[in-house]
């Protein structure tokens, strides 16, 4: 290998190592800070806002109203757990059984990819990372998830998740969603309304709370059944998530 190529390789390696250190400090500091401090915005919110501006849409506003868990209906927390991650109180960030099922499904159905991200993983991804699918992003997501699970309580993870989750075009967080779609605060959401909001979470830009399709209604009904099977509202109290 020539001297010039060695020099370039060495420069790139040093640059990447320094970048990794900077990102580790940035993300580690963010995890520590947001364990107690309110989250002002998420990476997904920034990405959506910048994308809108770049496409000339200056009327778009990524809107979120931060609320604490005692300002959120317990039905809402139960609904997202029933819909997205039923082992949330027990796992350390990853649901191995769901991952194995998703891998088996994806091998059989290449055109219908199924995910297995837990609420903890989704929180890490939405808060700190860019959208998309790659092994690099998945690796970073795994590291951030472990950091969040180590430092934050389960209640804190669920609170942040509910405050940054996307429920529609420009609608981030359960308070903004409750006001937009039901004209009430998140604390007043009913069991059925919470299940409907949770039903669009797989793809909130495709599935609409304001105009639910047959699939969304079917998923809402399934979520309601799962909420009942989990034990209803006492489930949240039992796991100290309310």
UniProtKB/Swiss-Prot annotation:
Keywords assigned by UniProt, alphabetized: Cell inner membrane, Cell membrane, Cell shape, Cell wall biogenesis/degradation, Glycosyltransferase, Membrane, Peptidoglycan synthesis, Transferase, Transmembrane, Transmembrane helix
Localization of this protein: Cell inner membrane
Matching SUPFAM superfamilies: Lysozyme-like (SSF53955)
Residue spans crossing the bilayer: 19-39
Gene3D superfamilies (UniProt xref): Biosynthetic peptidoglycan transglycosylase-like
Role noted for this protein: Peptidoglycan polymerase that catalyzes glycan chain elongation from lipid-linked precursors.
PANTHER family: BIOSYNTHETIC PEPTIDOGLYCAN TRANSGLYCOSYLASE, MONOFUNCTIONAL BIOSYNTHETIC PEPTIDOGLYCAN TRANSGLYCOSYLASE
Designated name of the protein: Biosynthetic peptidoglycan transglycosylase
Annotated organism of origin: Escherichia coli O157:H7
Gene: mtgA
């Amino acid at each position: 290998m020539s001297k010039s190529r060695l020099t370039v390789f060495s420069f790139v390696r040093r640059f990447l190592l320094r970048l990794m250190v900077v990102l580790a400090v940035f993300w580690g500091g963010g995890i520590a800070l947001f364990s107690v401090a309110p989250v002002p915005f998420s990476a997904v919110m920034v990405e959506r806002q910048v994308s809108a501006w770049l496409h000339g849409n200056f009327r778009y506003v990524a809107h979120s109203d931060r609320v604490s868990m005692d300002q959120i209906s317990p039905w809402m927390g139960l609904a997202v757990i029933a819909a997205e991650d039923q082992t949330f109180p027990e796992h350390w960030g990853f649901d191995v059984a769901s991952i194995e099922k998703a891998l088996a499904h994806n091998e059989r159905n290449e055109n219908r990819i199924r995910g297995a991200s837990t609420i903890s993983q989704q929180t890490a991804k939405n808060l700190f990372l860019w959208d998309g699918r790659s092994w690099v992003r998945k690796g970073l997501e795994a590291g951030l998830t472990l950091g969040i699970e180590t430092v934050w309580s389960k209640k804190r993870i669920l609170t942040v998740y509910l405050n940054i989750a996307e429920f529609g075009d420009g609608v981030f967080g359960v308070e903004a969603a409750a006001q937009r779609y039901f004209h009430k605060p998140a604390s007043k959401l009913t069991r059925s309304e919470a299940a409907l909001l949770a039903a669009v979470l797989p793809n909130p830009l495709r599935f609409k709370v304001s105009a639910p399709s047959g699939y969304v209604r079917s998923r809402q009904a399934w979520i309601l059944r799962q909420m009942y099977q989990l034990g209803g509202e006492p489930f949240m109290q039992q796991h100290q998530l309310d």
